[in-house]
């Protein structure tokens, strides 16, 4: 039997910031510096925390530490998640596919099919059961498919590299204060943490769909959009409204109000019309 010397594509993954490489808040720069100086894959928390089954919440026995390949992937992934972290909402504003690409964890088969298994298994089989992140997968009733996972970083995640929950909360308050100062200077009312989280959720959904689009996903969305747009406009808008009501919480709907909800319906409707007529961007 032939034994492979290496069963992974990239034994030394590292995080490469996206081309736009926007300036990050000082807290994120500080956290990334800490995470690069400390071996997060061999942190004491990885040995003392009890891994849990995400579906039922019961502890699961662990018999060994992270193997070196997964440890290398985790070191890169932690930096990527921090780079895309939204302080106000605790969300990672990037899809698993984008994180995988930027960490060099994605592979391409001879047939041209992309695989992000190494990154997704790291998150699903280790980081989430350990309590470092939480993931939420939402069914998009408008387009008829699953939206990319919404990844939230927990206080335990920051403890991997010695950033306390208090320091995180101070950064969140400072960030919200900066946002409100900017809004007030433009004549708008200040927002709460709930408002900031809702805005971040909307922005993330839009950005992730723009990034992860593939031919298969594109044409599937296009078919669903065409089906919806082919309906009477009033019926199409009612379908979108029901989907939006299901997407937002009661608190978020209260904050939006009738006018805000109507605006979201208009945005979604014209977005679907655009999808229905667009062609796949080959270049």
UniProtKB/Swiss-Prot annotation:
Domain of life of the native organism: Bacteria
The keyword Secreted appears for this protein: no
Record keywords: DNA replication, Plasmid, Plasmid copy control
Gene Ontology terms describing biological process: DNA replication; plasmid maintenance
Function according to Swiss-Prot or TrEMBL: This protein is essential for plasmid replication; it is involved in copy control functions.
Similarity field: Belongs to the IncFII RepA family.
The name this protein goes by in its record: Probable replication-associated protein repA1
Phylogenetic classification of the source organism: Bacteria, Pseudomonadati, Pseudomonadota, Gammaproteobacteria, Enterobacterales
Gene name of this polypeptide: repA1
């Amino acid at each position: 039997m032939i034994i492979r010397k290496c069963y992974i594509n990239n034994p030394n993954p590292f995080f490469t910031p996206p081309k736009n490489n926007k300036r990050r808040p000082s807290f994120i720069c500080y956290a990334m510096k800490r995470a690069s100086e400390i071996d997060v894959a061999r942190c004491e928390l990885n040995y003392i925390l009890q891994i849990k089954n995400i579906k039922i919440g019961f502890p699961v026995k662990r018999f060994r530490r992270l193997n070196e390949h997964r440890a290398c992937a985790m070191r890169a992934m932690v930096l990527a998640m921090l780079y895309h972290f939204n302080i106000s909402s605790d969300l990672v504003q990037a899809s698993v596919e984008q994180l995988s690409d930027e960490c060099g964890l994605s592979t391409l088969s001879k047939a041209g099919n992309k695989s992000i298994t190494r990154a997704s298994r790291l998150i699903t089989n280790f980081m989430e059961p350990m309590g470092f992140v939480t993931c939420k997968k939402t069914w998009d009733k408008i387009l008829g498919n699953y939206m990319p996972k919404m990844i939230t970083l927990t206080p335990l995640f920051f403890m991997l590299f010695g950033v306390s929950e208090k320091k995180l909360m101070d950064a969140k308050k400072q960030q919200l204060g900066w946002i409100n100062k900017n809004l007030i200077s433009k004549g708008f009312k200040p927002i709460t943490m709930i408002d900031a989280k809702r805005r971040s959720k909307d922005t993330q959904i839009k950005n992730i769909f723009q990034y992860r689009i593939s031919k298969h996903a594109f044409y599937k969305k296009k078919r669903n959009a065409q089906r919806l747009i082919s309906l009477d406009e009033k019926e199409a808008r009612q379908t979108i409204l029901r989907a939006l009501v299901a997407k937002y919480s009661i608190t978020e709907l209260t904050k939006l109000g009738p006018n805000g909800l109507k605006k979201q319906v208009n945005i979604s409707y014209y977005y679907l019309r655009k999808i229905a007529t667009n062609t796949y961007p080959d270049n």
